[in-house]
């Protein structure tokens, strides 16, 4: 079992990043790959959780130990697998998640991808009071210059599709941001806030 990896970030896709360490490239599933954009070809430390299946050994990575802790608590809930947990963690500010769990806000929890009423209730039952304090904002928030807004928006939409959001929902998101110019990370962050509001 791995705790973290330190190596050079060599590749970013809509679903995962690749970190090279000791001559090996590790494919790591992360909540928001584009939040690592500023770290390409640089040394990074990624906190890890390994999932072993019959057909695959999967690595899930996180910017911080707080982010990893949220993920681990989520996958302890019946009905929530690693992919769903990662989609939930993708919402940068997890304070809302913690507050919803502690206050039994089922409707809020059901706005997360693939979370129905039964699973939301189970989240409250299993996790209420388990978070000592709201975790810090997850992911990197450094802004970078953007000269190709539409390209960045395309990347953001692709990442949101990978997180489980439907094309119909994202069509409205694209229209909302079409005339703006942001980084993919900023688009994802803003889009998630709108999607959570319904």
Curated annotation (Swiss-Prot):
Residues 1-63 are annotated as: Domain I. Its main location: cytoplasm. Pfam families: HHH_5, RuvA_C, RuvA_N. GO terms for cellular component: cytoplasm; Holliday junction helicase complex; Holliday junction resolvase complex. Residues 64-142 are annotated as: Domain II. One of its GO terms (biological process) is DNA recombination. Coiled coil: none annotated. It is found in: Cytoplasm. Residues 148-198 are annotated as: Domain III. GO terms for molecular function: ATP binding; four-way junction DNA binding; four-way junction helicase activity. Keywords: Cytoplasm, DNA damage, DNA recombination, DNA repair, DNA-binding. Residues 143-147 are annotated as: Flexible linker. NCBIfam families: ruvA. The RuvA-RuvB-RuvC complex processes Holliday junction (HJ) DNA during genetic recombination and DNA repair, while the RuvA-RuvB complex plays an important role in the rescue of blocked DNA replication forks via replication fork reversal (RFR). RuvA specifically binds to HJ cruciform DNA, conferring on it an open structure. The RuvB hexamer acts as an ATP-dependent pump, pulling dsDNA into and through the RuvAB complex. HJ branch migration allows RuvC to scan DNA until it finds its consensus sequence, where it cleaves and resolves the cruciform DNA. Belongs to the RuvA family. Has three domains with a flexible linker between the domains II and III and assumes an 'L' shape. Domain III is highly mobile and contacts RuvB. Homotetramer. Forms an RuvA(8)-RuvB(12)-Holliday junction (HJ) complex. HJ DNA is sandwiched between 2 RuvA tetramers; dsDNA enters through RuvA and exits via RuvB. An RuvB hexamer assembles on each DNA strand where it exits the tetramer. Each RuvB hexamer is contacted by two RuvA subunits (via domain III) on 2 adjacent RuvB subunits; this complex drives branch migration. In the full resolvosome a probable DNA-RuvA(4)-RuvB(12)-RuvC(2) complex forms which resolves the HJ. This is Holliday junction branch migration complex subunit RuvA. The lineage of its organism: Bacteria, Bacillati, Bacillota, Bacilli, Lactobacillales. The gene is ruvA.
